[in-house]
């Protein structure tokens, strides 16, 4: 606990208003520096609507009482380090008090925080005590601003207390309450408040408590501060059995890495360490751990020195202030009082400047990211994270305990036991592995795994490390390795080479911290319902990632395509489609005797036996250096659990693969592949025959589905096999949580099977990879797409009040809604009714425009780049793209795409290869039951017809096609042509180019059968063939034929479909041209569109330009049409008709601002025509030579747009000072962004001259009032 393991610290302070962001930041800094367990603050001046403004990192539990007006207001802040459990809260509606009852470490505590009004304070407090009499007990503390002294010593004038105060003291005495400060300091003359009008000191802030609590009060003191005109009071309260609830594990502060001085100091330290300590007597493993210890100490020292330097002046002034106030309280003196006021003002200015810098840095970060698909937007919509604090747990007896010590013991013992069950039956492991055939890597592949680790591999891994992630136990972050890459990589290389030779890791590589993440929707009082995630040291992760990258190159040879989890190029929806195909096949079958089982594994990653894993790797042919390093990794790993912020005692990890290690998923898949191979090879476990293929399994890591015929025999043999596998591997299944679909025509047999199978029989649905698999495929829409619509409606309803513009809302749709929808489209591309898309579009548009009338037409927003890069997704086209992309898999004809060949239909599986860019089969029948592929085929043909494309004979028609096979060309000839020339007919050459394009083509002629050559020549030189094949392929054809990977496939098809189904829309830029009575060329329109995208890196700034160009703003003319009224005159009161160009430019009340802008341009020596198209649309004259100043002009113009929009429908004239303030805001934000992004030179080029002109136009009073000071010049 804060400060000690035996007491808590409580602070009380009147903050005198928190409506200023600077004041709130200063309060946060002060509270963090004091680090109390509980902080009571008064006079927040926040209203009921402003409660969200009071946020302090590390003090998430904040209880507030606020009124409707900006006065009074109290709050109690409880540190995250304090295990406080509230049981009752009472608030005053006017915000004068709040009472919170609760407990800390099972000791009861009641805190009443009071702000008494200036008049009648004693009577008010007395009334509060009367109202809350039943809640005040022997565990009560009352504190706050009482606005009255309680004793003679509480005033510097020694004036007697009045009658009301005497009555209050009497009431306190009757309820066994005492002034704790005065009791512990009976003769002290320290005060908390100075009254300037009366020139007197007084102690009107108090901590009052029950007499029973006095023995627990360790000490209390008054703390001078410069946040307000009050001093704070601090109380230390003893709590029995108080445990340290937070660990003090060191973690590198990444901000230090950005400090140039710190960076140079650390570079020198790293260089000196290795030069001094690298020798033959010290192993690289020990040297590396010693290096990290030295670095840790150096960072701590540098951070302490930096903080000391930063606070030296503040500490000096604070000491002076404390001494002067002490003297002033004893003997008042006017000159001393002036000195105190001066020091307070100086301290306030220093703190304000520091706070302002922090605020601007923070705002700059948001300035760059706000409304973009980035973290701020994600935070706005993310679900409230499950609380990681574990306050209750079921112990081994099944009883719920809240005792922190017992919770720690229960959790630690459970996970210690979980990871301690190491099997020693090595012979049984060998026997099991020898029973089944496993794939093996060849010598060349093994040598590839065992090649020496290189520096380039280490650099590539360091560059790819995700940033802003929690580090391992050593505290070093990914940013540390990236910042000192040049210095660290040479030694890391030597370290890894030493590990390769010796098979020994540094001790720190074995360490890990385990954090427990609650499984969603599970009972969190059960210790097994948490997911243990290992936080490993980054250096260990670098080594493991190198190993993972190497094995990943060969993983497809070792792992069957049934497994799609963590395998490159494989996707989860492959197995969903396969499962749907199997279910459809069973639905169609007349004789049903099948079962589909979704197997739930019990702590799968944590129970895998490490000896079995190592033996499996060896069985696959993996040996040598690669296996030696893996053996070393699993030699003696340890972990400590971080529970409620406290690090528990470490224990060994004898089983399992670490969740959080980059190598673990692949190692787990390799182990589970042994079981998968065994299931496939066991003939007594009969799968389901789909055409020529027997389908038994689908896996995504440990999520397994098994498809079986003859359930009684097959399921029993499956369970027996899994039981045998469990004995050697540690893998176990939870049969009660495993679910199954049972299909049988005979009710008696079905009942028998249900009685013998231990699985839960599902009657309607089974959830698999986020999709509801249904017992009958006809229910797929009902169980998946209808709930999806409901979920989206609920989400958008939850998000309706988020502080986000329409542009940000479009990005939320793209970031949070579109991926969900596409995943459903991918997994279940069935025919959807139009009502689904209508409802989906209606919901998203309602969210984007926040229940209001749309300002910009959907057709304009949906067109790419028409809205400055803010493109509204067209869900129907995404659906069409997802459905059609199956054709790419047909053309590729990959062996791994079993899901694509096994759909029940009248088409034979081998025919899919000949569907697109091939000769149509006359007798082809899809059949009425074709659920997915027929729908793809119909969409494919429809799009080809739309494009007027020949879908059958094209430049991408394959040599191994029906066109060539129907010529009775020998397979050997086809193979020879493919090996020597390519896979398409165009590669052979058509017309006069037939087999004469290259010397290799001519040489291939001699290798093929003469009769085949004659047939081929006849076909390839035919006029019809030449016309249809010898042409430039279209973009549509290239999408399906030229890309070897399906990465980005949907986006490519979608972008092409947007062009195909493009609709004519009103061009807003042409409307501007009409309003301005002029013509814009294509170049002008392109310039305006480009300007929307490039005018600023901040979307918050770009949004104004987008809104202006897209004609977003309502005008009197437009409103008159909407409301069907006759009043279309300018809202500013000039009397003219309020068209859009009038409101932005022509209005005589707006013109003075634009003339001021042009005066600034002349001061910048820029001669630009006084033309509205330039500031409003960014269309500069073609002969404008000062292109380098366009960035400067753009900032000025956009600031002017903001200023005009601010008074859009008000009878006010936009002022020059408002325009300058907006410019300065943009300037300040870009300044901090430029420093952070190392773009300061270009920033200076844009702003330097303009900064000088702005400062020259303002008086010193204006500069001070609006805090406008030079940032580039620094004066």
UniProtKB/Swiss-Prot annotation:
Positions binding dTTP in this chain are: 519, 522, 531, 600-605, 659, 702, 734, 737
**Gene3D superfamilies found in the cross-reference section:** Endonuclease/exonuclease/phosphatase
User: Which Gene Ontology biological process is one annotated for this entry?
Assistant: nucleic acid metabolic process
Q: Which InterPro entries match?
A: DNA/RNA_pol_sf, Endo/exonu/phosph_ase_sf, Endo/exonuclease/phosphatase, RT_dom
What are the binding positions for Mg(2+) 2 in this chain?
A: 43
UniProt keyword annotations, A-Z: DNA recombination, Endonuclease, Hydrolase, Magnesium, Metal-binding, Multifunctional enzyme, Nuclease, Nucleotidyltransferase, RNA-binding, RNA-directed DNA polymerase, Transferase
* Domain of life of the source: Eukaryota
Provide the residue span(s) of the region labelled Carboxy-terminal segment.
Answer: 1096-1275
Instruction: State whether it acts alone or in a complex, and with which partners, per the record.
Output: Interacts with MOV10.
Could you identify this protein by its name? LINE-1 retrotransposable element ORF2 protein
Lineage, please? Eukaryota, Metazoa, Chordata, Craniata, Vertebrata
